[in-house]
Curated annotation (Swiss-Prot):
UniProt organism field: Salmonella paratyphi A (strain AKU_12601)
EC number: 2.1.1.195
Protein known as: Cobalt-precorrin-5B C(1)-methyltransferase
Keywords: Cobalamin biosynthesis, Methyltransferase, S-adenosyl-L-methionine, Transferase
Lineage: Bacteria, Pseudomonadati, Pseudomonadota, Gammaproteobacteria, Enterobacterales
GO molecular function, one term: cobalt-precorrin-5B C1-methyltransferase activity
Amino acid sequence: MSELSFDAPVWRHGKALRKGYTTGSCATAAAKVAALMVLRQHLIHQVSIVTPSGVTLCLNVESPHIEGQQAIAAIRKDGGDDVDATHGMLIFARVTLNDSGEITLTGGEGIGTVTRKGVGLPLGSAAINRTPRHTIESAVREAIGPARGADVEIFAPEGEVRAQKTYNSRLGILGGISIIGTTGIVTPMSEESWKRSLSLELEIKRASGLTRVILVPGNHGERFVREQMGVDTQAVVTMSNFVGYMIEEAVRLGFCQIVLVGHPGKLIKIAAGIFHTHSHIADARMETLVAHLALLGAPLELLTLVGDCDTTEAAMEHIEAYGFGHIYNHLARRICLRVMQMRRFTKTPPVCDAILFSFDNHILGSNRPVDEIAKELQC
């Protein structure tokens, strides 16, 4: 990525969105400038780094402080126009020079601790991912030269509070934020980074020994699993709109059973072969309902009423009034068929189940008895 491409906005739905930089870039810049300040023994108010993607960032330094062979500096996180829980917070580095010739990197206040396998870091270590670890150590080494050593501590006073708005606790990263970023640059509304964060949760579940997974669109699905199915939500992973991607990831990781649980407003799209359920990709909810109601022999009057509906909930009222509630079992079976068709070239495809529920947490339908599915999930 060139500097020009970094400055150029990202266009989403007709809007120009500004790029930002990662917590990894902030930590790298803070560590570099702190090391330079110790060596030069004067405050520095601006520092430049080259990100892993090749972009040169020139960043303002905040709270610089020198005390003997130790210096502290902070860089303010700028997530651009991305939805970013860490935007605006200060990422600090404390660098203490020594004669060991080695650079040691630790996480301090507000940096999470790894408590589960699956994130690519040792248990008990600071949640500073591999790429930022490398860039931090390289930047400090460049500053201090080949002979000196340094103790580098990354900390973020707001980290514990900000982390509550992230997926960290679900990933087993407790007590603070993660220092992340493979490119050093934040791309606004990056679908790929979102998908990767969801996939990472799948990896952690698999690493913990789970072989069966429940994929839900969001929090409502997790609540339904807990309250109505009596199943431990440890097996639940959010898939958001990325149904196809998350199924492929679950297959890649070797899960033997995938259970899709959600409201018909999302899941019926899968019955039509739509594996990205965001409305800007495809809708077809009413068309799918009308087609399958027709297959079940529904009268033209019901088909017309459903076809004219704007919401799934409105369509469901008509379906109930006409006594066609059995369509949900039919749709659940169709969803599973579509999933199996998608994975037809997999050597050992997982068992697929689907459960549809209403907004008031009632089971609408499933491909087979829910009790049977729940029992298998508890094995």
